[in-house]
């Protein structure tokens, strides 16, 4: 019986099929399998021109064959002199040098014989043909001695060095025209799945675009490899086996995309075991658990999970170290920093949990805010400033706890970030884009945790700005009544962002004929709610009380989404019939909108931060007619009071 017809459930527990191997052990097991399978430890060397060597790794030490500079050279424009001839020169007692005692030189000129110093042109005064000097100069002032940069036979670069632009210039100055470097690794990316379609094609229900191959190939190129994507292979074990056999003949690493788990159509592990050696199937990391590591025909094979975040992190953990090893280079190490966690973080025991975070400096302290953690939420990697790894032995971290972050962006860029935590609104997304367009150094990083969560984060010093639209049912006011209750005596400013229309988001044409909140209890109406602590959730609960409706009577009340766009997406996909949200979200998905109320949405900021240079670009943006016009084009917004301080 072919191995791919053997059900995974029949595999013995001590087999490598879908286990929970710690990442470090998985790397060791894969390394042992590569060694036993005859995989090359390092790629062969080749000699390339300097012009083609950027990013390559040296295969031998680079020694200077000439000195640089190859002669004593003038380091400045001016006159070359004998330092001894300038002794005693001062403002009150200048020294005059006759034409035969100096030579005019430009930067880089060989030093004339008998001259050992250069006087800068701007320090030379002329009295007829004589040069008047008002200060003595020491020997070798502004003189570049032979070999100042590098001397003949000096080691310039070691073996295993990844070549940068400055390295190439130094090598050229030291006499090199070519360098011996390791051949660049060749990575083949093999996408699989009946549902996968090439980028640029129209997809129907149950079909997805092959974004993983694009991403993994680009990651390989960033790591110094030559990468190419192979045609998509359907979920057919015989065709997959043939594609794998053909691919390993012409690459140094084969990455098989998807099919790495233990589902009905997941064949990667069994094909690798049939064709070669299966070293590991299942690694104790999240996301990225169903990883396949093996060897086929002396070629390492990595089976990456189909979820994009899992695939990207799998490359970081397993593929990048292998590519560095093949080139004989050390692994690329990202900069690290310490940060305070903005909110509680729960993690499963037994797995290294890779959490994407946004970073910003608040009150002189680096703050990390976790991003959505789903393995399919690729935008969490797009927006991430860093990675927090919660080790397998921990169940998470408490708010305010100090953690170590692996940086994905520079500290300088992060230091300019405006951290906004609180209620979701599309205007903040628009502001983030506008700020970046005006000044690429400025980032507005929003985390959507609801109005209450934002005010708590502001109280705890974990953000610069909290977005809020909390309704106080007792007074009918928004946000202001909550400041004393949540922030205590903290001095804050409240800046009006917009007024916005809240209402029921329904399918086009309102097929159920809903008229308002009271219709949510009708049979067959499925509601999509916002999370606890969200201002929209508070508004819904207030409206339910006003209508005398119990939340238990609403089908879907317990189903929560984190943003207005997520609510609209659920309705658009037919997973719900109605949800309370803003008009702009309904318009974004081409849905109908039933108005319920118009409410203010405000930005709450600590008074100590309100006038800081960091926030100045945001306040300036809110006064911009261009930005206000862009907001109004979204629909359902009023900008008359935008930027006005209301407290």
Language model segments and positions:
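Phosphate-interaction motifs
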Residues: 9-178, 337-342, 390-392, 402
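Flexible glycine/proline-rich
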Residues: 24-27, 41-51, 55-60, 73-74, ...
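A conserved helix-loop-strand patch within extracytoplasmic ligand-binding domains
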Residues: 481-532, 622-628
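Short loop->beta-strand "edge-of-pocket" segments that line small-molecule binding or catalytic clefts
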Residues: 415-424, 518-542
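Periplasmic-binding protein-like
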Residues: 489-501, 591-620, 641-644
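A ligand-binding cleft/hinge motif common to bilobed small-molecule-binding domains
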Residues: 467-485, 568-597
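Ligand-binding cleft/hinge of the Venus flytrap
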Residues: 430-440, 517-518, 530, 536-559
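Phosphate-binding glycine-rich loops and their immediate beta-loop-alpha structural context
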Residues: 142-256, 417-437, 441-442, 446
């Amino acid at each position: 019986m072919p191995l791919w017809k053997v059900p995974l459930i029949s595999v013995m527990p001590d087999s490598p099929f879908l286990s929970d191997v710690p990442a470090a052990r998985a790397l060791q097991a894969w390394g042992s399998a590569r060694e036993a399978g005859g995989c090359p430890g390092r790629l062969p060397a080749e000699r390339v021109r300097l012009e083609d060597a950027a990013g390559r790794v040296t295969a031998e030490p680079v020694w200077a064959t000439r000195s640089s500079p190859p002669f004593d050279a003038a380091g400045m424009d001016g006159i070359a002199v004998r330092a001894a001839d300038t002794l005693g020169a001062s403002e009150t007692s200048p020294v005059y040098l006759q034409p035969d005692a100096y030579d005019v030189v430009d930067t880089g000129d060989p030093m004339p014989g008998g001259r050992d110093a250069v006087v800068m042109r701007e320090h030379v005064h002329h009295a007829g043909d004589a040069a008047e000097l008002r200060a003595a100069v020491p020997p070798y002032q502004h003189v570049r001695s032979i070999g100042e940069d590098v001397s003949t036979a000096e080691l310039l670069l070691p073996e295993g060095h990844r070549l940068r632009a400055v390295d190439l210039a130094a090598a050229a100055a030291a006499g090199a025209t070519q360098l011996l470097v390791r051949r660049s690794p060749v990575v083949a990316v093999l996408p699989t799945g009946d549902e996968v379609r090439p980028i640029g094609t129209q997809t129907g229900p149950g079909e997805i675009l092959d974004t993983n191959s694009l991403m993994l190939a680009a990651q390989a190129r960033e790591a110094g490899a030559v990468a190419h994507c192979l045609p998509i292979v359907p979920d057919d074990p015989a065709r997959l086996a043939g594609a794998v056999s053909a691919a390993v003949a012409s690459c140094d690493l084969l990455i098989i995309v998807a099919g790495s788990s233990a589902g009905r159509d997941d064949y990667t592990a069994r094909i690798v075991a049939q064709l070669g050696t299966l070293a590991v199937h299942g690694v104790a990391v999240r996301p990225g658990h169903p990883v396949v590591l093996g060897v086929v025909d002396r070629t390492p094979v990595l089976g990456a999970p189909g979820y994009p975040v899992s695939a990207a992190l799998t490359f970081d953990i397993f593929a990048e170290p292998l590519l560095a090893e093949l080139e004989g280079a050390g692994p690329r190490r990202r900069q690290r920093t310490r940060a305070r966690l903005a909110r509680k973080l729960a993690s499963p025991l037994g797995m290294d949990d890779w959490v994407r975070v946004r970073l910003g400096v608040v009150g002189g302290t680096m703050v990390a805010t976790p991003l959505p953690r789903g393995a399919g939420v690729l935008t969490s990697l797009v927006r991430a400033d860093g990675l927090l790894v919660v080790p397998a032995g921990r169940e998470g971290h408490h708010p305010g706890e100090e953690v170590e972050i692996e940086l994905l962006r520079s500290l300088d860029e992060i230091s300019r970030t405006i951290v906004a935590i609180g209620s979701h609104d599309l205007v903040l997304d628009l502001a983030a884009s506008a700020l970046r367009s005006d000044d690429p150094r400025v980032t507005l990083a929003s985390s959507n945790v609801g109005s209450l969560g934002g005010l708590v984060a502001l109280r705890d010093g974990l953000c610069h700005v909290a977005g809020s639209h909390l309704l106080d049912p007792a007074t009918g006011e928004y946000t202001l009544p909550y400041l004393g209750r949540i922030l205590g005596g903290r001095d804050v400013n409240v800046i009006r962002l917009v007024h916005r229309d809240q209402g029921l988001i329904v399918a086009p044409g309102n097929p159920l004929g809903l008229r308002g909140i009271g219709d949510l209890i009708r049979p067959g109406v499925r509601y999509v709610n916002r999370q606890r602590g969200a201002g929209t959730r508070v508004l819904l609960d207030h409206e339910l009380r006003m209508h005398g409706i119990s939340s238990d009577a609403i089908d879907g009340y317990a189903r929560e989404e984190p943003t207005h766009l997520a609510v609209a997406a659920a309705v658009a996909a037919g997973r719900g019939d109605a949800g309370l949200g803003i008009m702009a979200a309904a318009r974004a998905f081409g849905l109908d909108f039933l108005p319920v109320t118009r409410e203010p949405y405000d930005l709450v900021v600590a008074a100590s931060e309100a006038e800081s240079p960091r926030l100045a670009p945001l306040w300036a943006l809110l006064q911009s007619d261009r930005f206000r016009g862009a907001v109004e084009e979204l629909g359902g917004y009023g900008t008359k009071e935008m930027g006005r301080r209301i407290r």
